[in-house]
Design a protein with these regions (language model features):
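Small-residue-enriched hydrophobic alpha-helices in membranes
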Residues: 1-136
Length: 136
């Protein structure tokens, strides 16, 4: 068991969920992309029921704590800059999948970037990488 890898997985998954929900809508495109992130991160070792339970758990945490507290918790769990950049990149990818990055999604990504203590170029890099990944 690698605690650093587990923390990275949890941060990637939660940040993706937070971005997907930042505009108040968790649409089918975002849900499918979120599920793909989870399945890929788990190397296919999860089933639909587990993903549904994970989404419910994340929704409960967001409802109980609010977005700012959840961003803070994600940021506290990741100390390595390369891991922080990866969390931002995956979150930016989720933001791009349903018609581009909304103002709400961009604000949440900015909160993550600031909570990590990264400069604005880190977010710009993450957004550019995500945009090129979803470009036709």
């Amino acid at each position: 068991f690698d605690p650093e890898a587990a923390a990275l997985f949890e941060a990637v998954v939660e940040s993706a969920y937070l971005v997907a929900n930042s505009d108040g809508h968790f649409d089918e495109t975002e849900r499918a992309a979120f599920e793909h992130v989870v399945v890929t991160a788990c190397q296919g070792a999860v089933v639909d029921g587990q993903i549904h339970a994970l989404i419910e758990d994340l929704a409960d945490l967001l409802g109980e704590d609010g977005v700012d507290k959840r961003v803070e918790m994600v940021a506290k769990s990741i100390s390595r800059a390369d891991h922080q950049q990866e969390v931002l990149r995956v979150a930016a990818l989720l933001a791009h999948v349903s018609g581009g990055v909304s103002d709400e999604e961009r604000e949440l990504l900015s909160k993550l970037q600031r909570a990590f203590g990264l400069d604005e170029s880190a977010l710009a890099r993450a957004l550019a990488e995500a945009e090129s990944a979803v470009a036709p």
